[in-house]
């Protein structure tokens, strides 16, 4: 990878719009990044977090290469699903979505995802959406249907389909669709303002010049992005399932309003499979983050699992894969522990370790600059660990070398966010509960129960050691 004229390494990203890898060149500083966030009708599942981890990696790599970033991630707190949930439970929309929003932020922290600069909620931008709908109506791009909903006329946007590479003139279009989500076979005019239906919507609606109702999902993102980042942004990211219709419709709305390109780069992560199959509650392979935490896996292990594959490849999520990630993190933890051992004092870094470190940093940078190739970056990391361990084994290692290697690891961890520098373990709540129960059993001299609990703790990948100061929990 070459360096750019401003001494910043060239970064290449696969642009869904062109179906090619392109040299990243932002319009201005900071980079304007918009990512599709959660629809808070339920707890986010690991498929969602595969996308959020990819978006976090993208942001971290931009920061690593010296870009400043203004990041907006939306929260969809009104759509078909959130409305249905609130009505079913006969509560307000805010009351229904609040626990899922709170859980989302807790999950983000658990997975060490860097916070966005703003998390706009759709319900906070209704007035701006109404202004946009009025303009689209006045320009003849939108119309009011017989059901009193407002629709975007896709024939009024000649380049409709350019992101998903649909040829509009070759498709059989139905008249209109009011659902937020649909597939290409149901290509149609899409809803901007969904008219109120008492039986469907209960007590939830907003007043508007077009009648009671609520905004369409696609319009929400367009307005929040343009309000917070301006009419044209640098990168819009999400999952492949967002390409059509969501991102396609965002482009149509936004560019009809601003007459400017909405986003210069479009990045999309592939689907996550569980044991080779699509995740489904009916198949029993549907997992939220808290499901996995309750089974004894840590946030770092789950992050590593979701991080390790290239974002444009499907990720097969398995328990065996999680166990392998646990071992990879143990190898990192053991390496750091070894680096923190005492070594001979030296005022300078050994030439061999300096060359090894510089070569690794270049290989790591080249990998992530090539469309976020994290698999190659991780391979270079473990090769660096192997080479460093060999020098330690040969007693060709000093205290200065140790500090140098640790500094390199801290630098690349600004990208990875998984290297366990802290010696304190992140103990899952279920393991902590079992340790507490075992301690009670020991105090009651119920040795049989204590052994049963020890085995249960071991099944989560932890070992408990009894010391004078109390139980100590370690990973295998």
UniProtKB/Swiss-Prot annotation:
Record note on cofactor: Binds 1 zinc ion per subunit.
Entry's Gene Ontology BP terms: cysteinyl-tRNA aminoacylation
Residue window of motif 'HIGH' region: 38-48
Similarity comment: Belongs to the class-I aminoacyl-tRNA synthetase family.
EC number: 6.1.1.16
Reactions accelerated catalytically: tRNA(Cys) + L-cysteine + ATP = L-cysteinyl-tRNA(Cys) + AMP + diphosphate
Subcellular location: Cytoplasm
Residues where ATP binds: 281
Quaternary organization: Monomer.
Sequence motif: 'KMSKS' region, positions: 278-282
UniProt protein name: Cysteine--tRNA ligase
Matching CDD domains: CysRS_core (cd00672)
Requisite cofactors: Zn(2+)
GO-annotated cellular components: cytosol
Annotated binding of Zn(2+), by residue: 36, 221, 246, 250
GO molecular function: ATP binding; cysteine-tRNA ligase activity; zinc ion binding
């Amino acid at each position: 990878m070459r360096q750019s004229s401003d001494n910043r390494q060239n970064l290449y990203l696969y642009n869904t719009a062109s179906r090619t890898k392109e040299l990243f060149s932002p319009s201005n500083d900071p980079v304007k990044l918009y990512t599709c966030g959660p629809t808070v009708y339920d707890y986010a599942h690991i498929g969602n977090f595969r996308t959020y981890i990819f978006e976090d990696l993208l942001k971290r790599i931009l920061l690593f290469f010296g870009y400043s970033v203004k990041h907006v991630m939306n929260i969809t707190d009104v759509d078909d699903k959130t409305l249905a949930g609130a009505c079913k439970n006969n509560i307000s929309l805010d009351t229904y979505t609040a626990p899922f929003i709170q859980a989302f932020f807790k999950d983000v922290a658990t997975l060490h995802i860097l916070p966005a600069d703003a998390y706009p909620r759709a319900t906070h931008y209704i007035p701006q959406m109404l202004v946009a709908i009025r303009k689209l109506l006045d320009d003849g791009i939108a119309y009011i249907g017989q059901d009193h909903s407002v629709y975007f006329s896709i024939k009024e946007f000649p380049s409709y389909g350019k992101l998903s590479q649909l040829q509009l003139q070759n498709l059989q279009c139905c008249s209109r669709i009011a659902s937020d989500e649909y597939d290409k076979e149901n290509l149609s005019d899409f809803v901007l303002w969904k008219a109120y239906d008492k039986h469907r919507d209960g007590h939830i609606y907003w007043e508007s010049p077009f009648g009671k109702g609520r905004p369409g999902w696609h319009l929400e993102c367009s307005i929040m992005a343009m309000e917070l980042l301006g009419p044209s942004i640098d990168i819009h990211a999400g999952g492949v399932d967002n390409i059509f219709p969501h991102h396609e419709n965002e482009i149509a709305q936004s560019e009809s309003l601003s007459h400017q390109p909405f986003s210069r780069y479009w990045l999309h992560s592939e689907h996550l499979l569980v044991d080779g199959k699509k995740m489904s509650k009916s198949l029993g392979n549907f997992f939220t983050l808290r499901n996995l935490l309750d089974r004894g896996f840590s946030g770092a292990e789950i992050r590593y699992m979701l991080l390790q594959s290239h974002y444009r490849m499907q990720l097969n999520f398995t328990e065996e894969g999680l166990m392998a990630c646990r071992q990879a993190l143990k190898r990192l933890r053991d390496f750091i522990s070894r680096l923190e051992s005492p070594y001979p004092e030296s005022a300078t870094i050994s030439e061999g370790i300096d060359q090894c470190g510089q070569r690794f940093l270049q290989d790591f940078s080249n990998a992530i600059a090539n469309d976020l190739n994290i698999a190659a970056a991780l391979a270079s990391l473990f090769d660096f660990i192997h080479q460093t361990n060999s020098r330690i084994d040969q007693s060709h290692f000093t205290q200065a070398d140790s500090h140098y290697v640790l500094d390199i690891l801290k630098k690349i961890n600004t990208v990875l966010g998984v290297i366990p520098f802290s010696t304190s373990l992140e103990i899952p709540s279920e393991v902590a509960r079992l340790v507490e129960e075992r301690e009670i059993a020991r105090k009651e001299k119920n040795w049989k129960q204590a052994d049963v609990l020890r085995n249960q703790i071991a099944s989560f990948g932890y070992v408990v050691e009894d010391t004078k100061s109390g139980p100590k929990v370690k990973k295998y």
